[in-house]
Regions:
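Signature aromatic-anchored transmembrane alpha helix within multi-pass, membrane-resident enzymes
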Residues: 337-341, 447-479
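Perimembrane helix-loop-helix junctions
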Residues: 311-340
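Membrane-helix boundary/interfacial segments in multi-pass membrane proteins
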Residues: 5, 56-64, 126-127, 243-268, ...
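Membrane-interface transmembrane helices that cradle and orient dolichyl/undecaprenyl
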Residues: 268-292
Length: 634
């Protein structure tokens, strides 16, 4: 419980700090969401400059801690000075107004997190094993001798001749500093605090977007009603296989919104395009300082995850096209034409990527048949007819241009090459589809506000009840009774199987007792609460002095260490021995242990007892249903 209390207190402090930082930039006390987002962008850009340099030069992790603490102190002093110098203050009336206009934002985060807890299978398999990298990185960075050339899931050195793009992302390093300083359990920190923080970022982004659009509407929504636009995010939290099976929405890695929102990549994938265009939706003229904002924002998005690059480039060009059509600024039009010529020429010169095109066309062909996507198109078309609003049209043109740049042959070749990987290009498509659905839902609210003459209460309540009901119903066919799922999560209150936590801590204890690093073979998968659980990729969460050799099958291994030739076939030898002990499997397993310096074995049963002396291992400890053996004289 202490971990959750500290996390909630830290969440409140973080929101207050970032809002205050944004307030010093805007001088507008009432624009809570805008201040919070701008405060985050300002803060994270400043922090990331130093953290990325530390990573590129592979300096000790302690420099990251010193950098974060120093910058937070400097920014705190800046906030105080700015408040005094500019006579800024938040009165009791201002505070009440902020709460009144944003209380649903917190409630929406609560709903999203409740839905997250229902994604039981994804949590148990650690988000398709990806948590084995990201969560373990946050947990172990402070304790690693080589923090930026380590495979965080295996614990082995990750030596590569090529450039590691992960060094451009400061997100996990930044998170590791606060987790270390606060002493919060790493799993709770990632799956609770970071989840609710990123959900809150998304909610505030939608609120800011809606507020900016609302400024140019003839029939404006009251400030207290704008916050309800964020309920659209509940759609993305539907169980991902249900979304795909029903044809409601097909996008790359849709499961990440409902179960891995805490990932750094979730920020550009969900919010990237909106952060780039929202400040300029209502602009009549673009100035040089606006390019400065876009540059800083782009840097922040890349610092969260390098998948942001195609989102930034496609989104930026698309907005320039939309602005050139809806505004009268000659120099921007010329600049846009030059960029488009460059993109088209590059597309003709660069070779096509048929596989990359096929991936996104497959998703899009499914979405064009979905009720959700077709409904979004209809709502958008109706809004064009009803409102005849130049600034709404600008956003529509921006989104349409994004899809054109992604799908039109030859033109899209430049962006396909820019993405490097298929999944990166597909995630950019996810961002644009999410943005379109968010935009159309806001227009849906605007249309009913116009038709009902500012009497939105019924449609808001109806929409919220419908979305909440559907989000729960989407889970039931996959995971069963929600109450049973909540009971399981309550029994495993650290959001990871208790047995895995106990095993990880015990392995670290053994490593400390024997004063050595453990090279451990464990089952890749285990059954916990009658569900599959990916064990091997997570045992390092509490054990920085343990190397999980069984995780090599998922995360690979590079040259330069004793396990460079180890493959998933070798893990198969271990698995075969676990399944049946006969002359063939015993000899193969003995040969494997002689070939590699594996000094610790974990089995789900005591069948190794009769072979341990022959193999040169001693029984060390039983943890839940796991039996730990350590090599003699190791």
């Amino acid at each position: 419980m202490t971990n959750y209390i500290i996390s909630l207190l830290f969440f409140c402090v973080s929101v207050s700090f970032l809002y205050s930082l944004g307030f010093t930039l805007t001088k507008s006390v009432s624009e809570f969401s805008k201040n919070f987002i701008l405060g985050f962008i300002f803060y994270f850009s400043t922090i990331s400059v130093f953290l990325i340099l530390i990573q590129l030069f592979k300096l000790p992790w302690i420099f990251a801690l010193y950098s974060v603490v120093t910058i937070v102190i400097i920014l705190s002093v800046y906030i105080i000075v700015a408040f005094i110098k500019n006579k800024l203050c938040i009165t009791k009336k201002d505070f009440i107004s902020i709460v009144k206009n944003n209380y649903f934002s917190i409630f929406c985060v609560f709903l999203l997190y409740c839905i997250y807890l229902l994604q039981f299978d994804l949590i148990w398999i650690n988000n398709h094993l990806d948590d084995g990298y990201y969560l373990t990185k946050v947990a172990t960075l402070p304790y690693l001798e080589n923090p930026y050339i380590t495979n965080y899931s295996t614990g082995l050195l990750n030596i590569s001749n090529g450039f590691d793009s992960y060094l451009l992302s400061s997100y996990e390093t930044h998170a590791s500093v606060y987790r270390y300083l606060l002493g919060i359990d790493p799993v709770v920190f990632c799956r609770f605090f970071m989840n609710i923080f990123n959900y809150f970022l998304a909610v505030c982004t939608v609120d800011w977007f809606a507020a900016e659009l609302n400024k140019r509407m003839a029939y404006r929504i009251s400030k207290s009603m704008i916050q309800f636009c964020s309920m659209v995010l509940l759609i993305f939290a539907f169980e991902y296989t249900t979304l795909a099976r029903t044809g409601l929405l097909m996008v790359q890695d849709s499961w990440q919104f409902s179960s891995a929102m805490w990932y750094g990549s979730s920020i550009p994938r969900v919010m990237g395009l909106l952060w780039l265009i929202v400040p300029f939706i209502n602009r009549e003229k673009i100035q040089l300082k606006d390019f400065v904002y876009v540059t800083i924002c782009s840097f922040v998005l890349i610092a969260c995850s390098s998948i942001a690059l195609p989102i930034i480039v496609i989104g930026g060009i698309s907005y320039l096209v939309a602005f050139s059509v809806t505004a009268n600024q000659k120099n921007i039009r010329i600049f846009t034409v030059i960029i488009l010529i460059f993109v088209i020429l590059s597309g003709w010169i660069l070779p096509d990527s048929p596989q990359r095109s096929a991936v996104i066309k497959s998703f899009m062909s499914q979405d064009l048949k979905s009720i959700l996507f077709v409904g979004s198109i209809l709502v958008t078309a109706i809004s064009v007819i009803i409102f005849k609003n130049r600034f709404i049209n600008r956003t529509i043109i921006t989104i349409i241009t994004c899809f054109i740049l992604m799908f039109v042959p030859e033109i899209n070749d430049f962006f396909e090459k820019l993405s490097i990987y298929d999944f990166v290009y597909a995630r950019a498509q996810t961002c644009f589809i999410y943005t379109f659905i968010i935009f159309s839902f806001i227009l849906f609210i605007f249309i009913f506000n116009y038709l009902l003459k500012n009497n939105l209460k019924f449609i808001i309540v109806f929409s919220l009840c419908l979305l909440c009901s559907l989000s729960i119903l989407s889970v039931i066919p996959v995971y069963g009774n929600p109450m049973n799922i909540y009971k399981i999560m309550l029994n495993n209150s650290y959001l990871m199987p208790n047995s895995t936590i106990d095993l990880s801590k015990q392995l670290q204890s053994i490593a400390e007792i024997y004063n050595m690093d453990l090279n451990v073979l464990t089952p890749e998968w285990a059954s916990v609460e009658n569900h599959r659980h990916s064990l091997s990729v997570m045992i390092r969460t509490y054990a920085p002095n343990v190397n999980s050799i069984s995780a090599i099958g998922r995360f690979g291994v590079t040259e330069g260490n004793a396990f460079s030739s180890y493959t998933s076939d070798d893990t198969g030898i271990y698995n075969s021995f676990c399944e049946v002990q006969n002359t063939q499997t015993i000899d193969a397993f003995k040969q494997l242990l002689n070939e590699y310096p594996i000094n610790c074995l974990v089995f789900t049963g005591d069948f190794f007892n009769e072979y341990s002396t022959e193999f040169g291992y001693t029984f060390e400890k039983k943890v839940d249903n796991y039996y730990i053996y350590v090599k003699n004289n190791s």
